């Protein structure tokens, strides 16, 4: 008889907060808006804080399974919501490149004045911003879940189709453009609530840094930041070889490959890579999809705890 898997613990509701932030666009235009973010423990944690950067589309809920585990560990989680993705409002003339996204990120984190050890964690598109933030701010750890790479992955190829949709959206009446984008993204299988969210997700995918990430990886290699990079063999958006190219630039990682589940002995070996002077691990799971933020939530949370203890 097959063993019935234990039911997953009930996920608690996110604790959303609001804070007015001021930052500049890429053309140095001043923006002031009310940022909406998740803060699971606003009083702080003596263990440390994990800051999450969502995908496109995405939100703080990208990390709800990880955060639920962090709650049990007493580790604070802050989930950033980028403007225009359904929580933090967008603004006129918004660009979606990393310079502008980082200005927003830095403005919010400066307002929050987080004390103690910090781990930055990204999912998919958000991995670029997690990386840049880990370089620009004091960082104890970095976790990249299903990261994008240095070239366009299959989820956004061919790029000319995205450029065509972006141009078409710009000339259509807003109600028609939004209906078009909402229909396309829902048909693909993305969870979006509006056409505005869909077009912003697409534009942010079009404005990724790609190979320009290399300079940030090289800078991070000069620090003693612990790292975990996880990716899956059944990822329908990002090819394995694209992530492997990225891994070549990260110094000091120990590499693990699994076909299916990771047993406790194997998990302990991964955790050991975050101890002492060791810098961390990359973990490939052949059966996993693009959503290891759910399937490997326990591994990610345990890795964060181990990093904070180091």
Language-model features and meaning:
Residues 131, 135, 142-170:
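Flexible "cap/lid" loop of the alpha/beta hydrolase fold
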């Amino acid at each position: 008889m097959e063993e019935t898997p234990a039911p997953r613990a009930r996920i608690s509701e996110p604790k959303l907060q609001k804070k007015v932030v001021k930052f500049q666009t890429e053309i140095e235009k001043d923006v002031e808006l009310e940022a909406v973010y998740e803060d699971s423990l606003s009083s702080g944690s003596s263990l440390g804080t994990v800051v999450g950067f969502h995908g496109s589309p995405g939100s703080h809920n990208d990390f709800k399974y990880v955060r639920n585990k962090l709650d049990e560990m007493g580790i604070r989680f802050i989930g950033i919501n980028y403007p225009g993705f359904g929580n933090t409002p967008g603004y006129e003339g918004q660009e979606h490149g990393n310079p502008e996204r980082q200005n927003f990120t830095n403005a919010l984190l400066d307002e929050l004045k987080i004390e103690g050890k910090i781990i930055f964690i990204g999912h998919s598109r958000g991995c670029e911003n997690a990386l840049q933030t880990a370089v620009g701010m004091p960082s104890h750890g970095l976790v990249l879940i299903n990261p994008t790479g240095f070239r366009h992955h299959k989820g956004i190829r061919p790029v000319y189709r995205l450029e065509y949709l972006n141009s078409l959206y710009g000339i259509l009446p807003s109600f028609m453009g939004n209906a078009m984008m909402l229909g396309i993204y829902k048909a693909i299988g993305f969870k979006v609530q509006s056409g505005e969210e869909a077009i912003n997700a697409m534009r942010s995918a079009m404005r990724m840094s790609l190979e320009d990430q290399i300079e940030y990886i090289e800078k991070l290699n000069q620090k003693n930041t612990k790292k975990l990079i996880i990716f899956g063999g059944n990822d329908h958006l990002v090819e394995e070889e694209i992530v492997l190219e990225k891994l070549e630039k990260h110094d000091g990682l120990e590499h693990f490959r699994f076909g299916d589940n990771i047993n406790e002995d194997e998990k302990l070996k991964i955790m050991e890579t975050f101890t002492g002077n060791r810098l961390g691990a990359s973990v490939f799971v052949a059966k996993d999809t693009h959503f290891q933020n759910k399937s490997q939530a326990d591994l990610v949370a345990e890795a964060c705890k181990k990093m904070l203890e180091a």
